[in-house]
Amino acid sequence: MSFHRIVCLTEETVETLYLLGQDHRIVGVTGYAIRPARVRREKPRVGAFTSADLEKIKALNPDLVLTFSDLQADIAAGLIRAGIEVHAFNHRDVAGILRMIRTLGALLGCIDQAGALIAGYEARI
């Protein structure tokens, strides 16, 4: 399945999608998204980290919402009950971040771009 309308409820997924050249798929972001700087003028904000506006998210008609861990479990549960697909990441270290990038590449069909981004990070570590 290919996802075309994505809401990102974490800053790192927003930034990663931009770095992967997949920002055209983003239809909504967390209010904490600041990188790249243009995200603040390009994408609507749908709430804070632990208090997203479910009605606003549903109105954007996403086919995927990206969340983080148990900290956003209540938000994820509400979205799932509304029939929206949710993927929750649980990255808490560098290895987890690299797995997140790899997973996003697989979910969005941009595995080569994800691999290149990971290789760039690994070269700097």
What are the roles of these predicted feature ranges?
Residues 1-125:
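N-terminal ligand-binding lobe of clamshell/alpha-beta domains
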